[in-house]
């Protein structure tokens, strides 16, 4: 990825801001691996920036191509029904930007393999018991 490339980690969002903390950690890890790209987390709802705001901010930094990575387990109603409207908003907010959509994270075999490995070896979380 080049400096003119943006990567948006697109997440659902939640009213409790602590919910987003793992996604910010993931953003930092992605930014380390794609050092030349602008990497942000954008929210479907209950968080800022939304997709259009993130796209506009990237366009203001001369980003010309944005890859949107939906961090959803599957292509449910939000990705099938809500996302197209949000993408239209992003295209209006950043009309000179080319957008590319990755598959939903949970539909990727490498992600499923990593989750299977985690599920088998997951440590106990006594803080939530």
Region locations from a protein language model:
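Active-site-proximal alpha-helix that buttresses catalytic centers in soluble enzyme cores
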Residues: 1-129
């Amino acid at each position: 990825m080049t400096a003119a490339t943006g990567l948006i980690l697109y997440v659902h969002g939640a009213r409790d801001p602590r919910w987003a903390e793992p996604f910010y950690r993931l953003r930092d890890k992605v930014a380390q691996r794609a050092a030349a790209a602008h990497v942000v987390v954008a929210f479907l709802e209950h968080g800022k920036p939304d997709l259009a705001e993130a796209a506009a901010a990237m366009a203001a930094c001369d980003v010309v191509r944005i890859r949107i990575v939906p961090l959803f387990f599957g292509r449910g109603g939000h990705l099938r029904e809500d996302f197209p409207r949000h993408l239209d908003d992003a295209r209006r907010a950043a009309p000179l930007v080319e957008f590319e959509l990755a598959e939903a994270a949970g539909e990727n075999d490498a992600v499923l393999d990593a989750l299977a490995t985690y599920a088998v070896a997951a440590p106990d979380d006594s803080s939530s018991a």
